[in-house]
Structure formats: structure tokens, C-alpha cells
């Protein structure tokens, strides 16, 4: 993303609105603009304690041009009715940004005293390059800041345990790690010509064979410590069973759509460009993109090296260029499991989240329901939290702003993005309770 080509005025307007809507937060905190991202520091009573960070991102994905009329309410109107808050970013993730500020504003208005320093970090470009969170992370690292834990966006759903073969009950994810990210760009060159003489193969053929060769690479598959903790939490295995049967568990996970990305590096061809203009015309230069999500233990350099090796021999030798695309990131290091941040999330979630179909109208769990299980896991996407891994042993990706079934089906980046007012308020209640633990 070309930062100079971005219109930053909407971000300036958003920050001005934040200061107007949540004045106590910005009066009490030290406010810093880092690049176009925001860092607010609310000093605690005991400076010896490591700070906690609550974070989110201010940017949103675009609305597909031409679909604006398909929205029930204008996509950037922020329309609120009796049931829903509508608009792009209602779920991803203005709800968490606004909810954090609302919770802190409420706490300050009610005389909140906190031992630990609280950092609020709001990035500018999570949906693209993550430069904003990266800039904040570097500033904090240069200052020698070490966090106790942080909470970033996570899975927005409460899911049935049966989805994982775990019997009855309901679950929420607390993702403690994320996979690495790498885009591999393949390029082939050709003079083209008439399709009646494809001597040596067309550039499309060469590129296709290169894609297949790379997709056929076998990557190591294993049970990470975090996956082992997840399987134990789900009740699928005991710790002793995992230690004795890791190979069998890997095979089971590789056969499961839900679990296979958690045991190995994945490879997905996503883009191809440069076909010819006619059915009887051979294409000239072409390129393709293959997206990798790396399991802990496989580095960006490993991916580049193995892809180059896959196309280095035979008829492909010298005919395919392999480049690393922008925006790569290494997998999370092995995280702290069962730390104070996760325990706080577990304890508070047990008070505020139960069976989503049986919650009382005031947002509290219905009497007699079992609490939601909080499952430590790995997120297979990418988040801003990765930019803080060097200064934080417990990066928790967890959302207290739960979407309803319709929103799950539609997708958070789709038309008519929305969150219920009740879910938004429940997320704020969760955060207020979390603030009381600092």
C-alpha cells in the first residue's frame, strides 16, 4: 500500500470524533500519534508492574463498488435501530475500538483506580500492511516496554463444541498465536506466438507446472504445544494420550477441515495473470501468486528456499523466477499458555457468556446454563498482535463482541455488516470487568 496515496483525512476525522465522544480517556491519558496510528497511555499506580494493552484497528475493508444500493442502510452511515448497529466496520472492528474506549470512559467516570498501566493501541492499516501497529511496536520496544499481556481482535463467534467432535456445549476461542504469512510470486517469460507451434511449452503451461510442483511440497506436520492444550481443553484427548499418540493425532487432524491448518503449513494458489488475447494465441509473460501460512517451526526463508528448489530441476530449470512478495511475517514463537491474561479472560467470560440461544434480555447468562469454554488456539489469519510478539509473551486474540448466526453466514466483510446492540453492550460489560483486574 502506498501511504502517500492514502487519503488520511477520514482518520483525522475519526480521531477528532474519539476525543469528543470519550473525553475522559483522552484527558487522563498520554496521547501519541505514531505514523497515523494512535497510542494512549493511562499510567497505573505501580510503575513496576508490566502494562496491559487493549488494541484494535481503525481501518476497514472497502465496500465493493456498485454494491452500495444493496445495503439496508448506507454502509458508512453507522445507522442504529432498535436491534442492530449497521455499517462497514460494525464487526471488523469499530465495535472493539469503540467498546474499549466506552469501557475505559465508564471506568474513569466511576473513579477507576488501576495498579497497572493500561495502553490503548489503535492501528491504521491492519487490513493491508500493518505498518501502523508495526510502528507502535517498534516505539515501545525502543523504550524498553515489556507487556504482561495484550488483547487484540479474535474470533467473533460462540461455536458448538460438536463442530470439533467434542460433544455438547459451547466454545469461544482465545488465539494465543498465529501462523506465519508469505506470498510467493512466480514469473515466466515467453515471446508468445501462434498456438500451432507450442515448442517447449507455453508460459501458461510452464507456470501451471511450477504451481503444481510447489503445491506438491510436503511440509512437516506436528502437534504444537498450543494445539495439544486446545485438544485437552476440548476434551478430545488427555495430555498422556497426546504424548503417546502424536502421529495418529496428526493423521486425524490432517483429515479434518477444521484442524488440518493447525498441524501443518498450508499453500494456496490465489492469483494468476497474463493469459493470451485469443484462443489460438500463446501467452507471453505471466505471473502467479501462492499464499503460504506457516506453522511454528517453518520460516519465511524455508518457504522461499523450498519453492525455488521445487522449480530448479528438470524442464522447469531456469524458466521460473521465484520471488517473495511484500508483507511476509514469521509464525508466532511458542506462546505462554495459561498466563494471567488468559486466566482473566476465562474468569470474566464465565460470568458474561453462556449458550447464545439462552441469554437473558439484559445480557446476563440464563440461570442454570453451563459457562462457555474458552479454548486456547492458533489463528490461521493475520492480526496486528503479531507486531508486539517481541515485547509480549501473551498475545491474546479474543473478541467479546459476539456476532449472531446471520452475520456469521454473511461474513464480516460482506454487505449489511452489523452487530446487535445487545452484543455490543455485552462486550463493553466484559471489558469493564477486565479493567477492574488491572
Regions found by a protein language model. Name each.
Residues 166-170, 187-194:
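Flexible glycine/proline-enriched surface loops and loop-helix/loop-strand junctions
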Residues 42, 188, 292-294:
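Hydrophobic beta-strand positions in extracellular immunoglobulin-like domains
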Residues 84-87, 91-173:
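Acidic/histidine-rich catalytic neighborhood of metal-dependent amide-processing enzymes
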Residues 134-139, 191, 196-221:
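A short core secondary-structure module
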Residues 73, 115, 145-146, 167-169, ...:
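Short, solvent-exposed loop/turn segments at the edges of secondary structure
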Residues 81-92, 372-375, 415:
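Short pre-catalytic strand/loop immediately N-terminal to key active-site residues, enriched for Gly-Thr
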Residues 1-90, 97, 107-116:
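Acidic/His- and Gly-rich active-site-bordering loop/insert found
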Residues 31, 39-41, 47, 158-160, ...:
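An extended, acidic, His-containing surface patch that forms the Zn2+-binding/catalytic region
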Amino acid at each position: 500500500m502506498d501511504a502517500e496515496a492514502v487519503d488520511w483525512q477520514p482518520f483525522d476525522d475519526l480521531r477528532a470524533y474519539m476525543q469528543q465522544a470519550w473525553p475522559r480517556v483522552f484527558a487522563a491519558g498520554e496521547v501519541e500519534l505514531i505514523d497515523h496510528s494512535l497510542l494512549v497511555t493511562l499510567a497505573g499506580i505501580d510503575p513496576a508492574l508490566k502494562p496491559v494493552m487493549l488494541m484494535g484497528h481503525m481501518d476497514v475493508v472497502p465496500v465493493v463498488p456498485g454494491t452500495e444500493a444493496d445495503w439496508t442502510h448506507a454502509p458508512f452511515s453507522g445507522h442504529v435501530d432498535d436491534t442492530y448497529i449497521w455499517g462497514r466496520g460494525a464487526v471488523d472492528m469499530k465495535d472493539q475500538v469503540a467498546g474499549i474506549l466506552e469501557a475505559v470512559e465508564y471506568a474513569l467516570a466511576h473513579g477507576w483506580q488501576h495498579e497497572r498501566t493500561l495502553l490503548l493501541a489503535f492501528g491504521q492499516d491492519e487490513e493491508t500492511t500493518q505498518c501502523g501497529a508495526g510502528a507502535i511496536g517498534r516505539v515501545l520496544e525502543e523504550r524498553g516496554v515489556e507487556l504482561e499481556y495484550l488483547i487484540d481482535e479474535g474470533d467473533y463467534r460462540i461455536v458448538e463444541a460438536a463442530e470439533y467432535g467434542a460433544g455438547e456445549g459451547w466454545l469461544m476461542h482465545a488465539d494465543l498465536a498465529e501462523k506465519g504469512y508469505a506470498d510467493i510470486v512466480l514469473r515466466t517469460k515467453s515471446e508468445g506466438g501462434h498456438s500451432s507451434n507450442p515448442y517447449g511449452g507455453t508460459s501458461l503451461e510452464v507456470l501451471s507446472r511450477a504451481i503444481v510442483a510447489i503445491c506438491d511440497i510436503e511440509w512437516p506436520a506436528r502437534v504444537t504445544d498450543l494445539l495439544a492444550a486446545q485438544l485437552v481443553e476440548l476434551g478430545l484427548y488427555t495430555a498422556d494420550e497426546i504424548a503417546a499418540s502424536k502421529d495418529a493425532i496428526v493423521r486425524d487432524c490432517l483429515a479434518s477441515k477444521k484442524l488440518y491448518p493447525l498441524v501443518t503449513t498450508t499453500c494456496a494458489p490465489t492469483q494468476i495473470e497474463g493469459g493470451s488475447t485469443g484462443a489460438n494465441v500463446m501467452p507471453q509473460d505471466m505471473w502467479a501468486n501462492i499464499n503460504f501460512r506457516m506453522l511454528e517451526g517453518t520460516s519465511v526463508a524455508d518457504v522461499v528456499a523450498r519453492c525455488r528448489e521445487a522449480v530448479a530441476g528438470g524442464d522447469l530449470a531456469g524458466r521460473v523466477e521465484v520471488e517473495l512478495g511484500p508483507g511476509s511475517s514469521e509464525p508466532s514463537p511458542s506462546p505462554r499458555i495459561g498466563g494471567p491474561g488468559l486466566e482473566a479472560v476465562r474468569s470474566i467470560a464465565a460470568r458474561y457468556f453462556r449458550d447464545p440461544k439462552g441469554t437473558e434480555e439484559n445480557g446476563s447468562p440464563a440461570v442454570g446454563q453451563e459457562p462457555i469454554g474458552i479454548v486456547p488456539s492458533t489463528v490461521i489469519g493475520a492480526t496486528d498482535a503479531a507486531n508486539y510478539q517481541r515485547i509480549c509473551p501473551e498475545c491474546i486474540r479474543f473478541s467479546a463482541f459476539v456476532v449472531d448466526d446471520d452475520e456469521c453466514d454473511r461474513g464480516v466483510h460482506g454487505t449489511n455488516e452489523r452487530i446487535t446492540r445487545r452484543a455490543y453492550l455485552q462486550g463493553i460489560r466484559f471489558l469493564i470487568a477486565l479493567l477492574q483486574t488491572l
